């Protein structure tokens, strides 16, 4: 992001297990096109983690099968359409979770 680097706390983990070890009590929702569960059907809680894959391939199968994953969820799309890009998908999901939490900390 252009001028947002000072607002981000970026940590690069060596692997998915190391990442998950930093959030031991969090529920983890994996966003994938390969499920029938929609993202807005989740009752999000403070501390939940949202996992997204890259635009080309999504989340790798071995990560989707990880025992720490709480549920696979998807953002509905119109038939015969490609997917939204990662930024738009993350924005839709994060704002839904934040909305459910009453826009906690917002102005």
Summary of predicted features, one role per range:
Residues 47-48:
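A contiguous loop/helix-start segment that scaffolds small-molecule binding in enzyme catalytic cores
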Residues 1-33, 91-94, 98-106:
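RNA substrate-binding interface of SAM-dependent RNA methyltransferases
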Residues 16-20, 36-37, 80-83:
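A short acidic, often aromatic-flanked loop/helix-cap motif at beta-alpha or helix-coil junctions
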Residues 59-64:
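Short, glycine/polar-rich helix-capping loops at beta-to-alpha or helix-loop-helix junctions
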């Amino acid at each position: 992001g252009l001028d947002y680097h000072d607002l981000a706390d970026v940590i690069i983990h060596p692997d998915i297990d190391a990442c998950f070890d930093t959030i031991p009590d969090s529920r983890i929702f994996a966003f994938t096109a390969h499920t029938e569960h929609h993202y807005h059907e989740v009752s999000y809680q403070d501390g939940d983690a949202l996992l997204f894959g890259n635009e080309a391939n999504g989340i790798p199968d071995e990560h989707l099968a990880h025992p720490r994953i709480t549920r696979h969820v998807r953002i509905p799309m119109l038939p015969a359409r490609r997917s939204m890009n990662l930024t738009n998908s993350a924005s839709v999901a994060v704002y839904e979770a934040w909305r459910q939490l009453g826009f906690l900390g917002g102005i």
